[in-house]
Regions:
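Bacterial extracytoplasmic/cell-wall-associated proteins, especially those involved in peptidoglycan
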Residues: 19, 64, 80-300
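N-terminal Sec-pathway targeting helices
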Residues: 1-14
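Short, glycine/charge-rich beta-strand/loop segments that flank catalytic centers
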Residues: 49-51, 73-80
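Glycine-rich loop/hinge motif
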Residues: 38-65, 152-158
Length: 300
């Protein structure tokens, strides 16, 4: 079978530009043999897990040269009404949480809008993967196994926006680099995230504040392991020490692992957790007294 080839020629000064069969050729008029033009390859761009939009913009600037402010403005102005998975997102909220972290190939001429489209497409595919057999009800709400009676803002179940918000908190609470570790270490991190998701669901179920240091860091713009007492008093709806329930929106762009965690949590009787230093491994507690003992044991 012969492939059909399309040929387009453009003559500029002493050179004819020919497009044929998906390749570009420059033919000088005095030469018969075409000379292929050097094709600029796509650029591999890696957006790591758990970055906020401002950090994604910084990464895009470093890897593709698009100014940070330009990308941030494009995100702010992006028309996203056609995406079904964004229907539960408040109209005035940003796309925080939905720019899926992954490794992409972008043409050097890619615009901010094209990059955003690819990342939103990545989220759509990965969220569907995380769902597995779990489907939303007729109202677009997910009823989470083990937490069927959970109500958020007087409504039973979790919307996609609420799930992504919780996943973004879990991402920042449990994220650590296991890229060079074993499959066992990655599996352990996945299990930790599902267990932490269960802890947060336990707290949400009784109206107990999440008390997430990651949300404090988002409110203050810092990246510290232990926020100061002054940080904990920050006036912000993202301060989950002062405000019970979920934050107003996501605090990062979570990984597939964290999306799976909120959709398929591990139900336990734990209500507290902390991170061993320096490994970052999570230690769980059933009550505050156990939590204090673990702090004295692992955080000295």
């Amino acid at each position: 079978m012969h492939k059909r080839l399309f040929l387009v020629t453009i003559t500029l000064f002493f050179v004819t530009i020919v497009f044929v069969g998906g390749a570009l050729y420059a033919i000088q008029r005095r030469h018969r043999a075409p000379e292929p033009i050097a094709v600029v390859p796509d650029t591999k761009v890696t957006i790591i897990e758990g970055l906020a939009i401002s950090e994604v913009a910084t990464s895009i600037e470093k890897q593709l040269g698009i100014p940070k402010a330009t990308f941030e403005q494009a995100v702010k102005n992006f028309e996203a009404s056609e995406y079904d998975f964004l229907k539960s997102k408040p109209a005035k909220s940003s796309l925080e949480g939905f720019l899926f972290p992954d490794t992409y190939l972008f043409a050097p001429t890619s615009t901010s809008e094209e990059i955003i489209e690819r990342m939103l497409g990545g989220f759509e595919v990965r969220f569907a993967q995380a769902q597995g057999s779990l489907k939303p009800n007729a109202n677009g709400v997910f009823i989470i196994s083990g937490y069927e009676n959970l109500s958020i803002n007087g409504k039973r179940g979790m919307t996609i926006y609420e799930l992504v918000t919780l996943a973004s908190i879990i991402e920042r609470e449990t994220g650590r680099d296991v890229s060079k570790g074993t499959a066992d270490s990655r599996e352990r991190l996945d299990t930790e995230r599902r267990t932490v998701a269960g802890i947060f669901y336990n707290r949400l179920g009784i109206g107990q504040a999440l008390q997430s240091d990651a949300t404090i860091n988002y409110a203050t713009g810092k990246r510290v392991a232990s926020p100061s007492l002054e940080d904990l008093d920050v006036e912000s709806l993202y301060n989950t020490y002062e405000h019970a329930g979920l934050t107003p929106g996501p605090i990062s762009n979570p990984s597939l692992s964290s999306l799976e965690a909120v959709l398929h949590p591990i139900k336990t009787n734990y209500f507290y957790f902390l991170h061993k230093q320096p490994s970052g491994e999570v230690v769980y507690s059933r009550n505050f007294d156990e939590h204090v003992r673990n702090k004295n044991l692992y955080l000295k």
